[in-house]
């Protein structure tokens, strides 16, 4: 009535207002982000039951891995774990490729966003040597992982290969990284989200994969393995002893455990 119009036309930036009510308390907030922060923006393609980017990053952070040390994901799926590792190794800000809802708001000067994004790009370390290897038996998974790595800007930092990881482990080829003999004196790191639940195949294939891991770890005692799974049998079937550490986590709504097997310190 004040403006003598029926409705206001939509114009300008979008302000996503969220209202929550708990008993007698009302909270009104503005969403400055847009899509959830666990979405880095690089995952354009995925396979069944992909692991969240934030969970993959946490798995890498809780391991012994650092830039320059060999990291292998033998069940890489759409590549989330190796991609997150590569981004951490390059010191890339998690949301470096994202655009946020508040960037269109007049209250925040565009120059501030530009300056912060510039600082984030300047902080990227392109010189650290990265030895990251990702395998999967599924051709479509490898193709998706390679596309996602390219979108994240780390395509050249990860060596992807379609392969049967059980066979690689049993043949010892996980340590024979390439023709130049790219090995790690400290012992490599396996970080993986093996098949289970929606991702599980037939029991025989899973048993064969576990047997491959078990054989590889026996033959390479300085290697460490970090695996997330709801399958409590992994301690017996892979490690043949209790894990050095366990952490209860959630992969989506599924309760899982992050099993940490620490390899022996290499002899001087």
What is the predicted role of each segment?
Residues 46-50, 76, 250:
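Alpha-helix capping and helix-loop boundary segments enriched in small/acidic/polar residues
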Residues 25-27, 68-71, 131, 189, ...:
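Beta-sheet entry/capping signal
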Residues 20-22, 77, 163, 230:
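Short loop/turn motifs enriched for small/polar and acidic residues
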Residues 1-53, 60:
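Non-catalytic, mostly N-terminal accessory regions of nucleic-acid modification and defense proteins
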Residues 51-168, 198-199, 205:
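Conserved S-adenosyl-L-methionine
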Residues 13-15, 128-132, 157-158, 188, ...:
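Residue-level recognition of the N-termini of beta-strands and the immediately preceding loop/turn
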Residues 164-167, 171-268:
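C-terminal catalytic and target-recognition region of SAM-dependent MTase-like enzymes
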